């Protein structure tokens, strides 16, 4: 049910990201397409009003690597869907994007902290001048907080935001995969090393945040 929610049911960070989207939009790892559908509705409303504001939505391209997700999105009414990997060189050949969305822990697709620069360089290559990446994540340090308020984190071990993830629905289990949560200071530092500016847009109620890379 969480994957099929409407704009009204989304957490405030996702609503904020959708409100900030503008121009030609790329929705990465769209899942069931809830964000693309919300943006489609907004774009249709803007067109009906004849609005020509600079922050209007002009187009929405939706991508996911799962054929089943793409089929579900098609059935739900998402219009421009492509079953393609973000790193496929065919993506973005024609033109860049003004807004790239990576929501529901957008850093996750990097898998490991060592892969984050590769992800950021790829996103940068897909941006138009003055374009933006809107990405959310969480700082998992709260998991390691002890009763004294200190954090028991092994600084010599792997980065604490690297986790093993597995999708389960009733008795059906997917294959485990690497998933990454990143604290904002580290995300900002890595983004800047890739030639991107990192900006904290908003914080959620439980160590989660929305950032803009530009």
Task: State what each model feature region is.
Residues 97-117:
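A short SAM/SAH-binding and catalytic strip from SAM-dependent methyltransferases
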Residues 23-31:
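Conserved class I S-adenosyl-L-methionine
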